[in-house]
């Protein structure tokens, strides 16, 4: 079947994007790699002055039989060295990125070897439905999001965001004068019917939204994941009202099976054979990218949560038309993701291969399932057993939430003036005093408003007295996690006057 080309969405580009002209120097940088050219065109330091001749690494060996967190031993270790230069391709069978190239200016889209691995990975994970898609390396999803705002948004423009969303993403938008208008969510993520209602009732004269920013899987902060059938409905709404979908997916591969409360049933499920690659791929949530027939989706992926945050390396997948202004922006801002990072990640992935990388991702699923189960077990054990305290076991990501009906607090009306956020702040400080940090949900709340404003019904909250706290099971040992949640439970028992 012949796939269509993507649509042209350049009419959504920002004034900055439309004003930016390509750097003339970047048009000739490719000639630096031509051995027939004496390159006198740019201030590129001589590679002889790079004070590193090689980079040697020990990394675990697929299929990681002892688990991905096990110490690396001689039997389960890959040792390799990446050199500054190679005489020819035969001297570089692993397709490493030479240090002389990785540490030089150029290749703002990313090093070709790494991009080729990512393209192959993308074909395995996503069912792409238009032909002119490509990938562009980034310095992680924070950089990718900041670039997206600059490519598409002017001051005063409006974007749609989940009612509670990653605070740094909201702050990035607000710092650029972009209005973040909240869309209602529930335990299954964005509610399509309410999104449609927001758009149907959009105030005439208010700027129309250009983007919908969403964290579909293991959402930060709520831990929710958008159900597949909802994604289809959301995509159709985006088509109808002509906005782009920015799919921020750092937690996509931290998907898990649903939480099983009964320990015997859980042990039975865990005793079943380990998933093979095909089963793993089939179990993954459908993506907005796989639904996209027009180039309307901009997907942001990152190695931060699957390899290490300090790599500061990720990629954007989108149409070549949309990626072009990103490249022009990066040529004048980040130049390129760090060369050492690209060398290290590419060398590891090329030796693992696509199958080995899937083995790693399967290992992550196993580890995070254990961590999630530990957290939810402790919450059910130590939190008050009351309808006022709701736990939503996540099926992906690093976060859980405890939803609390503030109105049941005995001093809600007197001490806290019926203000749920006064109680939230008080509880936050009480929990910290007990030596535990969980984060108030209000820190992630989007409260942007357009001018003229949107109708009141578009901003209604189902129960304004519900507050929540976000915790993570990613950062500490099971023992510390359990103790921390016990202290959280003790605080709630005491503050709400509930006897154990």
From Swiss-Prot:
Names of the cofactor(s): pyridoxal 5'-phosphate
Species assigned in the record: Saccharomyces cerevisiae (strain ATCC 204508 / S288c)
Protein name, UniProt field: Aromatic/aminoadipate aminotransferase 1
GO molecular function, one term: pyridoxal phosphate binding
Highest taxon of the lineage: Eukaryota
Miscellaneous note of the record: Present with 1770 molecules/cell in log phase SD medium.
Enzyme Commission number(s) from the entry: 2.6.1.39, 2.6.1.57
GO terms for biological process, alphabetical: aromatic amino acid family catabolic process; aromatic amino acid metabolic process; L-methionine salvage from methylthioadenosine; L-phenylalanine biosynthetic process; lysine biosynthetic process via aminoadipic acid; tyrosine biosynthetic process
Catalytic activity: an aromatic L-alpha-amino acid + 2-oxoglutarate = an aromatic oxo-acid + L-glutamate; an aromatic L-alpha-amino acid + 4-methylsulfanyl-2-oxobutanoate = an aromatic oxo-acid + L-methionine; L-2-aminoadipate + 2-oxoglutarate = 2-oxoadipate + L-glutamate
């Amino acid at each position: 079947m012949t796939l269509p080309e993507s649509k042209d969405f350049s009419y959504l580009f920002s004034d900055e994007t439309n004003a930016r002209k390509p750097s003339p120097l970047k048009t000739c940088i490719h000639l630096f790699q031509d051995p027939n050219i004496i390159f006198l065109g740019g201030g590129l330091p001589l590679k002889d002055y790079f004070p590193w001749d090689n980079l040697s690494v020990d990394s675990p060996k697929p299929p990681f039989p002892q688990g991905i967190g096990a110490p690396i031993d001689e039997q389960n270790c890959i040792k390799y060295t990446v050199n500054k230069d190679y005489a020819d391709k035969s001297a570089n069978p692993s397709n490493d990125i030479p240090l002389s190239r990785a540490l030089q200016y150029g290749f703002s889209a990313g090093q070709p070897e790494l991009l080729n691995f990512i393209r192959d990975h993308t074909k395995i994970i996503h069912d792409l439905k238009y032909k002119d898609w490509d990938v562009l390396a980034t310095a992680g999803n924070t950089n990718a999001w900041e670039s997206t705002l600059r490519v598409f948004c002017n001051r005063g423009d409006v974007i749609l965001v989940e009612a509670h969303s990653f605070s740094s993403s909201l702050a990035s938008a607000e710092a650029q004068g972009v209005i973040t208008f909240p869309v209602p969510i529930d335990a299954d993520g964005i509610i399509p019917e309410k999104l449609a209602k927001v758009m149907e009732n959009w105030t005439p004269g208010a700027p129309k939204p250009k983007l919908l920013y969403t964290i579909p899987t293991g959402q930060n902060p709520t831990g929710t994941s958008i159900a597949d059938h909802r994604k289809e409905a959301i995509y159709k709404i985006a088509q109808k009202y002509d906005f782009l979908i920015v799919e921020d997916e750092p937690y996509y591969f931290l998907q898990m099976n649903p939480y099983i409360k009964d320990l015997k049933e859980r042990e039975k499920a865990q005793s079943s054979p380990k998933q093979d690659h095909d089963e793993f791929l089939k179990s993954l949530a459908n993506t907005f990218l796989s639904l996209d027939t027009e180039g309307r989706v901009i997907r942001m992926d990152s190695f931060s949560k699957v390899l290490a945050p300090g790599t500061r390396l990720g990629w954007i997948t989108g149409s070549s038309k949309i990626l072009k202004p990103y490249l022009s922006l990066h040529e004048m801002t980040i130049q390129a993701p760090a060369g050492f990072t690209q060398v290290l990640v590419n060398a590891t992935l090329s030796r693992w291969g696509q199958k080995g990388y899937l083995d790693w991702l399967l290992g992550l699923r196993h580890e995070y399932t254990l961590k999630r189960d530990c957290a939810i077990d402790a919450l059910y054990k130590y939190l008050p057993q009351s309808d006022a305290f709701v736990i939503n076991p996540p099926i992906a990501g690093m976060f859980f939430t405890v939803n609390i009906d503030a109105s049941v607090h005995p001093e809600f009306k007197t001490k806290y003036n019926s203000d749920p956020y006064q109680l939230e702040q008080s509880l936050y400080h009480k929990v910290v005093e007990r030596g535990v940090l969980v984060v108030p949900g209000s820190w992630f709340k989007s409260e942007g408003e357009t001018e003229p404003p949107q109708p009141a019904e578009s901003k209604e909250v189902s129960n304004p007295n519900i507050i929540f706290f976000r915790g993570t099971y990613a950062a500490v040992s099971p023992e510390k996690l359990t103790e921390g949640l016990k202290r959280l439970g003790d605080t709630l028992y005491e503050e709400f006057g509930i006897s154990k």
